[in-house]
């Protein structure tokens, strides 16, 4: 594929740009026009810019399995942040000037998706250059979504229910932690429990989704990470799933991470995008996953919702009690109350957003954010400290887990209560270039 290098003869210089910046391309265009290139040529430029950003921001490119030549060119050109921003501006203008795609809805989604990715790229450049951006504005520019706000009173109502469930004299966070300890998976049982759960997640998913016959995954157990689990998609329907063992893993974490990172979560999502869009349509932009982009809201939201889809109603509780509790050699005598607690703790999930919002906006410091998480999310002090590390690295990304799940649930369940219908809408979401705003537009 011929790589088009886009350069307007007169480009507005961004704040970080200087007159000393060298030229950023050999071909000049008087203005970005639709005749300048096909969309595939524009995608080639897009891939080069994202890969160039990855040289400045190590976590920016979450996965890339496209042509190696683009990665080599990004390394060879060594574009500065200002140069990437300039070329992204021209590329956005070119995309906006493309002829109307008429009734081709997929093409419209493709072009809009590229524009949103470029807006997110510009936002990450600004952040890397030291710009201060309000939390909600940042999340909209990166993920095309703004999470709802909740005050302390919202969480206090839920905390009162937990207090009634686990009465005692000690502070509520200490009571919760003491009760939960009996459900920690022993270290020597962790691998067997996780691998059993992941296989069950896979079995249930494959009953509804046709994945490539050669799809596969491997598991690693790691430490010193700010996250609890991670899927590193390798391409060719293969994933490396890492489980962080810094903090204790509870019995419910096995299914949660198995579905989230694997089936029908990240591994499934990436495999379908590769199969349907990269190989099926030749849309090479989907051979690169920019972590800080609207795609992440759908990725994280669908991965979290996928747990409920694969294990509807009480099926998850039954599976864990009948299979994982014995495998972990845990006593299930208090399991019923434990699952009642988990349901209530899930309702505190948005407390993490409030901690991140206040901390990143400078309204509270790290110590205050940690205390908020202990008081209102009922985190252990260790988990609260780990969360601050996550906020430092991933910032407003935190909204993708809970608000993303809510948006995906709304979209999928708008099709009715029939289980198979929900799976079909879920598959549609995972196989298409839908953006977060499409989830509300298409849920009607």
Which stretches of residues belong to each language-model region?
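Bacterial N-terminal signal peptides
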Residues: 5-13
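N-terminal maturation segment of proteins
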Residues: 17-444
């Amino acid at each position: 594929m011929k790589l088009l290098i886009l350069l307007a003869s007169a480009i507005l210089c961004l704040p970080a740009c200087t007159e000393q910046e060298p030229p950023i391309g050999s071909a000049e265009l008087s203005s970005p026009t639709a005749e300048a290139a096909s969309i595939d040529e524009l995608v080639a430029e897009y891939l080069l810019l994202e890969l160039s950003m990855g040289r400045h921001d190590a976590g920016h490119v979450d996965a890339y399995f496209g042509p190696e030549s683009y990665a080599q060119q990004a390394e060879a050109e060594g574009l500065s942040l200002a140069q990437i921003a300039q070329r992204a501006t021209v590329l956005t203008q070119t995309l906006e000037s493309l002829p109307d795609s008429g009734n081709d809805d997929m093409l419209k989604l493709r072009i809009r998706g590229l524009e949103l990715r470029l807006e997110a790229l510009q936002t990450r450049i600004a952040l890397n250059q030291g710009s201060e951006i309000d939390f909600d504005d940042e999340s909209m520019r990166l993920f095309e979504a703004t999470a709802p706000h909740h005050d302390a009173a919202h969480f206090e109502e839920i905390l009162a229910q937990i207090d009634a469930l686990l009465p005692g004299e000690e502070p509520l966070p200490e009571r919760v932690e003491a009760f939960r300890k009996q459900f920690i998976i022993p270290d020597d049982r962790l691998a067997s429990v996780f691998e059993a759960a992941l296989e069950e997640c896979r079995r249930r998913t494959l009953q509804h989704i046709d994945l490539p016959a050669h799809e596969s995954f491997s598991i690693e157990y790691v430490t010193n990470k700010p996250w609890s689990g991670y899927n590193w998609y390798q391409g060719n329907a293969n994933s490396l799933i890492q489980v962080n063992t810094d903090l204790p893993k509870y019995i419910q974490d096995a299914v949660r991470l198995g579905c989230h990172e694997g089936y029908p979560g990240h591994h499934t999502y990436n495999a379908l995008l590769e199969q349907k869009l990269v190989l099926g349509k030749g849309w090479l932009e989907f051979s690169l996953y920019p972590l800080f982009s609207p795609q992440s809201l759908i990725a994280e939201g669908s991965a979290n919702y996928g747990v409920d889809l694969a294990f509807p109603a009480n099926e998850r509780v039954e599976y864990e009690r009948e299979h994982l509790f014995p495998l972990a050699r845990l006593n299930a005598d208090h399991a019923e109350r434990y699952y009642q607690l988990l349901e209530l703790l899930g309702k505190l999930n948005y407390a993490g957003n409030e901690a991140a919002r206040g901390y990143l906006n400078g309204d509270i410091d790290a110590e205050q954010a940690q205390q908020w998480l202990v008081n209102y999310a009922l985190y252990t002090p260790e988990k609260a400290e780990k969360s601050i590390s996550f906020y430092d690295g991933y910032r407003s990304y935190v909204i993708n887990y809970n608000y993303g799940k809510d948006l995906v649930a709304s979209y999928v369940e708008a099709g009715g209560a029939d289980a198979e219908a929900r799976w079909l809408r879920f598959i549609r979401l995972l196989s298409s270039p839908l953006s977060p705003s499409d989830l509300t537009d298409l849920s009607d």
